Amino acid sequence: DRKDIIKPIGFHRESTALTDTDMKYLLLYLEETYGLTSEKKIETAIGIVANENKYHPIRDFLNSLAWDGTERIRFCLRHFLGADVDDYTYEALKLFMLGAITRAFKPGSKFEIMLCLVGGQGAGKSTFFRLLAVRDEWFSDDLRKLDDDNVYRKLQGHWIIEMSEMMATANAKSIEEIKSFLSRQKEVYKIPYETHPADRPRQCVFGGTSNALDFLPLDRSGNRRFIPVMVYPEQ
């Protein structure tokens, strides 16, 4: 749902995302050049043009890749974080990455699994998730509360989202909240400049990090949504 400007428009910009500052420049330019003064109509026109020129940077990136035949997933967590090279670790990372790719190509696909990296402080767990996201703007570790009405803003434009603080302070109640949150396949909300709320299928997946081995409280119903992998960076 984010609007991007991907071509030069005559003034310096820090990113491709359309910002309020960009809108001010555009409104001033259109008024001085063409005498257009209706902000509402200009925003409507921008929305129509954006809708007719949709693109998906993550899909475009993934489609541009060519596999060279080298096995990587099995040894990835060992290489970066010293995790064991075994079938469990391999299947855990493969499942997580398949979920991320599926959500990118088929938004709203059911995927309620969280890969949880467990190891000492400074092990590089957060950095690993950031690297998996490929680009900094596709990663976020800013998700602090799940009961915030504006939590959807923390998901917009991101592909891999780390829950670190929530996992660090998890208790039985908060774990149930996280499990319920992971089970959602979409959010329903209205974005700025729109009048009506709409379904927004999820295009992201969630990773967890913890320094403690016992970060999951005892749950008789099971904690199947959380897949912990021990990491040993000293190895």
Predicted regions and their residues:
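AAA+/SF3 P-loop NTPase mechanochemical coupling elements
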Residues: 150-157, 191-209
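P-loop NTPase catalytic core of nucleic-acid-dependent motor ATPases
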Residues: 46-156, 160
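A short helix-turn-beta junction within AAA+ P-loop NTPase domains corresponding to the substrate/partner-engaging
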Residues: 216-235
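Conserved AAA+/SF3 P-loop NTPase catalytic/coupling segment centered on the Walker-B
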Residues: 159-182, 216-222
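Short glycine-/polar-rich loops that comprise or flank the Walker A/P-loop
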Residues: 157-159, 184-185, 202-205, 221-227
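N-terminal nucleic-acid engagement/recognition segments and initiation subdomains in replication
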Residues: 1-75, 87-91
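Conserved catalytic/switch belt of AAA+ P-loop NTPases
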Residues: 175-198
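Conserved RecA-like P-loop NTPase ATPase core
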Residues: 126, 164, 178, 207, ...
